[in-house]
């Protein structure tokens, strides 16, 4: 299926463009769209090196998480220096993993990353954990099967959250809503009532990026 990108707001449209078509985001006409040609996301596609990059990414990612868990154990045991070194190493491993993830062409813009994340969560709750739970039940590990299903339900909510955030990004509603909203500065706590968050916090001068819709759950 053909893909076209709006040259103004970068919205991607799948399918042919009609003469009266307008961008759903910025309302530009079809003439402002250019066809997007699919290409490999990385120069290593289909090679052994690509497989090695994925293996390196997985290994570094696991090492990073293990180090954070080990740091927690060391801290509880009273070994502050060892805990700190575990955490320092974890940060190193995170950067190593990022190198290989970027080389694989997997790090996109925020909209692409939200979609990627949502698709990953969808796989986890619809396929991966469902299969794991069934196999655990078959082997008699019923408590673990219940945990797999419990985590699957959480992953489902994660997918829903990512898709809601993606919709906000695509429709430009991250910092502007259709009605009056209470906005809170994530840095200093200043509250603003209005349709949109201010360009800058009038109290601490942090930019609009620090504002979010105020929420109370107590």
Where are these regions (language model features)?
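Non-heme di-metal
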Residues: 2-218
């Amino acid at each position: 299926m053909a893909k076209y990108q709006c040259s103004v707001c970068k919205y991607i449209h799948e399918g042919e463009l009609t003469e009266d078509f307008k961008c759903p985001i910025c309302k530009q006409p079809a003439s402002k769209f250019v066809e997007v040609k699919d290409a490999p996301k990385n120069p290593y596609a289909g090679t052994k090196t690509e497989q090695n990059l994925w293996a390196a990414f997985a290994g570094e990612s696991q090492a990073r998480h293990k180090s954070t868990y080990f740091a927690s154990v060391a801290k509880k045991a009273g070994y502050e220096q060892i805990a700190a070194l575990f955490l320092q190493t974890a940060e190193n491993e995170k950067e190593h993993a990022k190198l290989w993830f970027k080389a694989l062409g997997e790090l996109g813009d925020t909209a692409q990353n939200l979609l990627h994340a949502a698709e990953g969560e969808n796989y986890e709750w619809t396929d991966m954990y469902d299969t794991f739970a069934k196999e655990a039940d078959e082997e008699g590990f019923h408590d673990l099967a219940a945990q797999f299903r419990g985590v699957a339900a959480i992953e489902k909510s994660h997918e829903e959250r990512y898709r809601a955030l993606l919709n906000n990004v695509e429709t430009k509603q991250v910092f502007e809503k259709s009605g009056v909203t209470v906005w809170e500065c994530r840095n200093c706590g200043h509250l603003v009532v209005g349709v949109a968050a201010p360009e800058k916090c009038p109290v601490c001068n942090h930019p609009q990026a620090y504002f979010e819709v105020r929420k109370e759950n107590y």
